[in-house]
A protein has these predicted regions:
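Short, acidic Ser/Thr/Gly-rich low-complexity loop/linker segments typical of extracellular
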Residues: 62-77
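Beta-strand-rich domain onsets/edges
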Residues: 18-37, 41-47, 120-122
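Short Pro-Gly-centered beta-turn/loop motif in secreted/extracellular proteins
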Residues: 79-88
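Short, ordered, surface-exposed loop/turn motifs in non-cytosolic proteins
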Residues: 36-38, 47-62
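A short, solvent-exposed loop/turn motif at the edges and junctions
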Residues: 63-65, 90-106
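Short beta-strand edge segments in extracellular beta-sheet folds
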Residues: 105-112, 118-122
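N-terminal export leaders
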Residues: 6-9
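Short strand-edge motifs at loop-to-beta-strand transitions and within beta-strands
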Residues: 78-80, 113-115
Length: 123
């Protein structure tokens, strides 16, 4: 019984949706391990087309500082330089007319798989 309650709570945390103006902000808690760089690809939800020109920011744990940022290339790929290991950071993924996604990450020394982020068109 306790396990199922924890799973439900975890599911709620992973699917928290907050309305912000015209865009929806999805806050997803995800801990990943990163070796040399935090890399991934941003796709448009529903079509899986690459999302080019999307801003990907690595923010400090208090959200006050953008540690590093980049934009996706024409194929939706991005790569951020590795910050200090063992620390908690947030990733913010945004583009005009698209929902905003924010992820919590803890940087470790191990290798991580490439992230795939699906952005939805804002409604």
């Amino acid at each position: 019984m306790r396990i199922s309650k924890r799973l439900v709570l975890l599911g709620l945390l992973l699917s928290l949706v907050v309305r912000t103006g015209h865009a929806t902000m999805r806050v997803v808690q995800k801990e990943i391990s990163v070796s040399r760089a935090l890399a991934g690809r941003v796709l448009v939800r529903g079509t899986d087309e690459p999302a080019s020109g999307v801003t990907v920011e690595l923010c400090s744990s208090d959200w006050k500082t953008v540690v590093t940022s980049t934009k996706t290339d024409e194929n939706g790929h991005f790569s951020l330089e590795q910050p200090a290991t063992g620390k908690l950071f947030y990733i913010r993924v945004s583009a005009p007319g698209m929902d905003i996604y924010e992820f919590r990450v803890r940087i470790q020394k191990h290798t991580a798989p490439e992230l795939t982020i699906h952005l939805s068109v804002a409604t």
